[in-house]
Curated annotation (Swiss-Prot):
GO cellular component: cytosol
Reactions catalysed: apulose + ATP = apulose 4-phosphate + ADP + H(+)
GO molecular function, one term: glycerol kinase activity
InterPro entries on file: ATPase_NBD (IPR043129), Carb_kinase_FGGY (IPR000577), FGGY_C (IPR018485), FGGY_N (IPR018484)
Lineage, uppermost ranks: Bacteria, Pseudomonadati, Pseudomonadota, Gammaproteobacteria, Enterobacterales
GO terms for biological process, alphabetical: glycerol catabolic process
Source domain of life: Bacteria
Positions annotated to bind ATP: 13-15, 267, 308, 408-412
Function recorded in the entry: Involved in catabolism of D-apiose. Catalyzes phosphorylation of apulose to form apulose 4-phosphate.
The name this protein goes by in its record: Apulose kinase
Gene label: aplK
Amino acid sequence: MYTPVILAIDEGTTNAKAIAVDERGRILAKAAVALQVTHPQPGRSEQDAMAIWRAVCQAAEVCLSSLHRAQVVGVAISNQRESVLIWDRQTGKPMTPLVSWQDRRAEKFCQALQGSAEARLIESRTGLQVDPLFPAAKLHAMLAELPNGVARAMQGELCIGTVDCWLNWQFSGGRAFSTDYSNAARTQLFNIHRGCWDEDLLALFGIPSVCLPAVTPSSALHGHTGVTGISGLAACVPIVALIGDSHAALYGQGITQSGEIKATYGTGSSLMTTINTPHLHATGLSTTIAWHDGELRYALEGNITHTGSGFAWIGQMLGVPSVTQLTELALSAESNQGVFFVPALSGLGAPYWDVQARGLLCGLCDATTPAIIARAGLEAIAYQVADVFFAMEQVSQAALPALRVDGGATQNRWLMQFQADLLQRPLIRNHNAEVSALGAAYLGGKMLGWWEHNEQIAALPREVEVIEPSATNHAILESYQQWRTAVARARLRPEA
C-alpha cells in the first residue's frame, strides 16, 4: 500500500524548497537548496534560470528520497513573483537570465509614465502602480536588449514567462506553456476585471501576445510531468497547482474570507488580505488576484521591497554575513539610540511607491556602535510592515484585530514581539516555515478531490502561537514616529 502525496515546490529568491504532503495535509518530508542572485550592474538583479531548475530537481529528489512507500500523485508549484525570463520556444534554451523582481532596469521608463494618462490606465486595468517591480516594464527593456528580440517575439519564436510558467515548462518537458491567474495578475499586462491579457497594455509595453502563456486557474490541470530525471517522480504525473508565493501563503494560512490579514517575511515582505471585488485607488496598496480555484478571488496587498535583504545588506556592510550572528549583535544593543535605517536600496515599495527614494542610515553620532546599526536594520523590518498594516487599516476603515505571520524572520521571537508591540495587535505565528508550499499543495489537493471546500482546508490543523502585545510602550510608539521622519528624509529630492 502506497501513501499518495503531492510534491509541492516553493521556488523563492534565495531557496528552492520541496515538500511532500499527504491527504491529511501533513508534511511527510522536505528539503531545500540555496540559490544565488547576481548584480552584474547597479540596479540589476538576475538569476540563472537553469540553475533554478537544477535546484528544484535537487530539492525534490532529496525530499522524495526520505519517503517510504509513497507515490507522487500530483505536483504543485509556488513561486517568487514578478521575476521573468525569455526562452527559445523551439529549444527551450533561456535567452535571458531570470530578471528578478528586485531588478530596477526599467526605472527611467517607469518614471516617464508617472502621473500620465497611461499610468492611470495601467492601474485601472491591473490594480498595480507603475513601478519597475512588475514584469511589463522589465520585458520592454529585455526585448530591446535581446538581439532581434522584438522581431523574434513577433514571429512567436520566443516564450515569455514568470517562474511558475518556466517550472511548468520544465516539469512537462516543454509540453505545457501556461501560468495561473495570480502570477498573470502580477505582470501588469493582465486585465484583472476581464481575466485576460490586455491588448492595450501589451501595445503600450510592446509585448506581442503570441509570446505569452495561456492563463488557467491556480487549482487546475496544468499539464503532466515528462521524464525529469528526478528519482521518485514518474512521468505523466499531473501538475495540479500553480500560484505566486504570497498568494499561496495566504491560502496556506487558511485565510479564504475577508477580514483577516497575513504578512509573509522574506527577502521582501508582503501583507495581503482577501477582498470580494477589486478595490482600486487604495492609496499605497495594490489590488490583485489572490487565486482562482473555480472561483476568482481578489486580494489587497502591500509589497515591501527590502526587509530580509535590507537586514542582510547591513550585515555585509558590517562584515557580519551570518544572519544569526547579525541578529545576536543587534540584540546586544539595548535600544537603537535614535539610529534608523531606511532600506530604500532600490526605491520604496508599499505604501510609498517611490522609485527615487534612496537608502538612508541616520541619527549617527560618535557613540554609535555596530550593534546599534545592526539593531536599526532589524527594527526596519517591523517598521515597514507597520507602515503597510496601518495603510490597510485606513483603507478598511476598521481596526484589524490581528496579524497572521509566516516566513523565515518569524522565527525571531524578539522581532515578532517588537512587531506586536508596534502594532498593538496580537500576532498569530505559524510555526510551519513552509506555508507557501503548503498553500500550493492545498490547491493541488483540491484539484485532486482531496478536499472539496475551502472551509475544509481552513479547518486543517495548524501549529500556531499567539504573541500578545505588551502594554502600550510609549518609547516604541515614539520611535515609530521618528521612523516616519526618517522615511520622509529618504524621499527628499536633491535640488537640481
